[in-house]
């Protein structure tokens, strides 16, 4: 009877219970548990997601500020490099969220040298790629400001953050990046990749790179007709 539940199942139930209180914003209870066991922030559920990750996922900035005050130096207690079963870190989840202030809080606390901005998951996806896929312009610019490399490629498809922004149809992000970095879009998304998308996924991307003659969505800053431009596809892929 003393081993009614496996230890890993008990751990998962406990983290699930803590996760529920994080979602509900019960900071007082969390503070009591933290005083008893500070390493509670690194305990994980069955998916490998730590308590610190769930604080980031639920966007509890009050929890984050409490944790940061408890450390003598960044990373003393919090293992912000911990990854779940898919290889995602807390930064991967923060990069996908709309509230970029939480991402700025974490990046500002751990600093440029205190966290691995370009840490990929098991598919080679970095946080800046996740931000590009979701169209989180402010998140992507914050990550780049703290040292993220937007030209790094994932393992399976060989796409950079620039490629994902174009492929997923995030027009505002594409325009913002092109305006900020003044690079022709054809450098980010070569035409040959369109054929790769078609063969692999049996569908066309939402944005394609086309000539600057007809149905042009937007011209590049240089206004050079020899440059390639962005054209938005309709539902028929034209």
Swiss-Prot record:
One of its GO terms (cellular component) is host cell cytoplasm. This is IkB-like protein. Coiled coil: none annotated. ANK repeats lie at residues 48-80, 87-118, 124-153, 158-187. The keyword Hydrolase does not apply. Keywords: ANK repeat, Early protein, Host cytoplasm, Host nucleus, Host-virus interaction, Inhibition of host NF-kappa-B by virus, Repeat, Ubl conjugation. IkB-like protein that inhibits the binding of NF-kappa-B to DNA, thereby downregulating pro-inflammatory cytokine production. Forms a heterodimer with the NF-kappa-B subunit RELA/p65 and prevents the activation of the NF-kappa-B transcription factor. Inhibits calcineurin function, which is required for the induction of nuclear factor of activated T cells (NFAT)-dependent immune response genes. Prevents the binding of substrates to calcineurin without affecting the phosphatase activity. The C-terminal region contains the docking motifs PxIxITxC and FLCV, which are required and sufficient for binding to host calcineurin. The gene is A238L. The lineage of its organism: Viruses, Varidnaviria, Bamfordvirae, Nucleocytoviricota, Pokkesviricetes. GO terms for biological process: regulation of gene expression; symbiont-mediated suppression of host NF-kappaB cascade. It comes from African swine fever virus (isolate Tick/South Africa/Pretoriuskop Pr4/1996) (ASFV).
């Amino acid at each position: 009877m003393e081993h009614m539940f496996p230890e890993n199942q008990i751990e998962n139930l406990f983290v699930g219970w803590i996760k529920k209180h994080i979602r509900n914003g019960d900071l007082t209870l969390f503070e009591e548990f933290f005083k008893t066991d500070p390493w509670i922030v690194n305990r994980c559920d069955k998916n490998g997601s730590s308590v610190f990750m769930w604080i980031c996922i639920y966007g509890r900035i009050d929890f984050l500020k409490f944790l940061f005050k408890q450390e003598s130096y960044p990373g003393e207690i919090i293992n912000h490099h911990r990854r779940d079963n898919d290889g995602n870190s807390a930064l991967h989840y923060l990069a996908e969220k709309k509230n970029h202030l939480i991402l700025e809080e974490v990046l500002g606390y751990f600093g440029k040298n205190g966290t691995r901005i370009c840490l990929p998951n098991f598919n080679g996806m970095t946080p800046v790629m996740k931000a590009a896929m979701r169209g989180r312009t402010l998140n992507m610019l914050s990550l780049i400001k703290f040292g993220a490399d937007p030209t790094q490629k994932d393992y399976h498809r060989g796409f950079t953050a620039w490629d994902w922004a174009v492929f997923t149809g995030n027009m505002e992000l594409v325009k913002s990046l092109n305006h900020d970095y003044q690079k022709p879009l054809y450098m980010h998304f070569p035409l040959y990749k369109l054929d790769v998308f078609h063969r692999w996924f049996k569908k066309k991307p939402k944005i394609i790179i086309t000539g600057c003659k007809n149905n042009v969505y937007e011209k590049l800053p240089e206004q050079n007709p020899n440059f390639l431009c962005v054209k938005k596809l309709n539902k028929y892929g034209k």
